[in-house]
């Protein structure tokens, strides 16, 4: 089940990356590159930091093919995307939590503790989007008050709590997927935001 969600997630993330590249007027190569970075960048950063080799997309090059195809398809169906915004927000929410779970599980399988596992989950969940926004010369989404990285962080610790309470692994995954997905959609619906820090060094 988690593999299927992962495939859906990287496809959706690749398409959002392609749209971001399109808004910047990039050529097809740029579109494919941004799409792949968005979909696979978080997992790659996690693998490098944890020394988890080979990288996921190197071990499974079909993921690279899938994200590239998703980017090309997006070029042709981009005019329809505005009508599918709600669907993409839902898929993105699923992807965020699925990536977070995979990041946590990868760290735990390597023998790391809960703190490292939670950080691994957040990196996997959000870093692809950070790289996308940086490459597209935008302020990363997670730094703009919106509850995104926070959802990933809470989902990671909720999953770890479930494991600590010795819930069956599949049950822990399902509960985390549901709660993280619901929290993300509620944050979007009700515009929940993190407090903003504004510093002005003018002396009066």
Model-derived regions, located:
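N-terminal topogenic module of multi-pass integral membrane proteins
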Residues: 1-40, 44-56
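Short, structured motif recognition centered on aromatic/hydrophobic residues
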Residues: 33-37, 44-50, 119, 123, ...
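Ordered, amphipathic secondary-structure segments that act as subunit-interaction surfaces
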Residues: 69-106
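Structural signature of hydrophobic alpha-helical transmembrane segments
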Residues: 1-10, 55-69, 113-125
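Helix-coil boundary and interhelical linker segments in multi-pass alpha-helical membrane proteins
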Residues: 1-2, 48-58, 102-116, 161-172
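Small-residue-rich transmembrane alpha-helices that serve as helix-helix interface/gating elements
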Residues: 173-186
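Cytoplasmic-side transmembrane-helix entry/capping segments in multi-pass membrane proteins
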Residues: 29-37, 60-64, 85-96, 120, ...
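C-terminal ends of transmembrane helices
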Residues: 14-24, 47, 72-85, 130-140, ...
């Amino acid at each position: 089940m988690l593999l299927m969600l992962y495939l859906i997630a990287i496809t959706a993330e690749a398409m959002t990356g392609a749209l971001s590249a399109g808004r910047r007027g990039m050529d097809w190569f740029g579109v494919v590159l941004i799409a792949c970075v968005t979909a696979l960048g978080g997992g790659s950063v996690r693998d490098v930091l944890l020394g988890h080799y080979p990288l996921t997309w190197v071990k499974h090059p079909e993921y690279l093919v899938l994200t590239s195809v998703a980017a090309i398809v997006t070029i042709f169906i981009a005019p329809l995307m505005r009508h599918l915004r709600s669907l993409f927000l839902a898929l993105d929410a699923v992807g965020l939590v699925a990536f977070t779970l995979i990041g946590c599980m990868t760290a735990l399988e390597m023998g790391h503790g809960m703190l490292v596992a939670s950080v691994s989950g957040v990196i996997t969940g959000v870093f692809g989007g950070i790289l996308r926004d940086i490459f597209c010369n935008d302020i990363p989404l997670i730094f703009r008050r919106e509850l995104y990285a926070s959802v990933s962080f809470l989902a990671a610790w909720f999953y770890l709590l479930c494991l600590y309470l010795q819930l069956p692994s599949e049950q822990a995954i399902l509960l985390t997927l549901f709660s993280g997905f619901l929290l993300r959609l509620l944050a979007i619906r009700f515009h929940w935001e993190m407090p903003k820090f504004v510093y002005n060094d003018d002396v009066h």
